Amino acid sequence: MAGLKDVVTREYTINLHKRLHGVSFKKRAPRAVKEIKKFAKLHMGTEDVRLAPELNQAIWKRGVKGVEYRLRLRISRKRNEEEDAKNPLFSYVEPVLVASAKGLQTVVVEEDA
């Protein structure tokens, strides 16, 4: 899998409404965090997924049961610089502020490094 070796950043729209359907009110925000980690793991192919504090605030801003229907996410696959790291790559997930997340496509973001 040569595709997993590169460092890449993409923007996704995740539909949390369908992933949280049927989840009891007091477990919706914690389940949203788990579902975002699962989504990033699936799309980036990394076991190590880290969430930005801003993303956590975006999930929880309307309380435990008022999670947004859709969130726009920027997921970056980066190299792990720690010497004793189990995985060579990790994913970093942060929110993207948009007026409406409806109808947006997945795009590759060019990094200015």
UniProtKB/Swiss-Prot annotation:
Location in the cell: Cytoplasm
Extra facts: Present with 57500 molecules/cell in log phase SD medium.
Summary of the function given for this chain in its UniProt record: Component of the ribosome, a large ribonucleoprotein complex responsible for the synthesis of proteins in the cell. The small ribosomal subunit (SSU) binds messenger RNAs (mRNAs) and translates the encoded message by selecting cognate aminoacyl-transfer RNA (tRNA) molecules. The large subunit (LSU) contains the ribosomal catalytic site termed the peptidyl transferase center (PTC), which catalyzes the formation of peptide bonds, thereby polymerizing the amino acids delivered by tRNAs into a polypeptide chain.
Gene source species: Saccharomyces cerevisiae (strain ATCC 204508 / S288c)
Protein name: Large ribosomal subunit protein eL31B
Entry's family note: Belongs to the eukaryotic ribosomal protein eL31 family.
Short name of any one Pfam family annotated for the protein: Ribosomal_L31e
Any one GO molecular-function label of the UniProt entry: structural constituent of ribosome
Assigned keywords, A-Z: Cytoplasm, Ribonucleoprotein, Ribosomal protein
Gene Ontology biological process terms in this record: cytoplasmic translation; regulation of translational fidelity
Subunit structure: Component of the large ribosomal subunit (LSU). Mature yeast ribosomes consist of a small (40S) and a large (60S) subunit. The 40S small subunit contains 1 molecule of ribosomal RNA (18S rRNA) and 33 different proteins (encoded by 57 genes). The large 60S subunit contains 3 rRNA molecules (25S, 5.8S and 5S rRNA) and 46 different proteins (encoded by 81 genes).
InterPro entries on file: Ribosomal_eL31, Ribosomal_eL31_CS, Ribosomal_eL31_dom_sf
Record bears the keyword Cytoplasm: yes
Major site of localization recorded for this protein: cytoplasm
One annotated Gene Ontology cellular component of this protein: cytosolic large ribosomal subunit
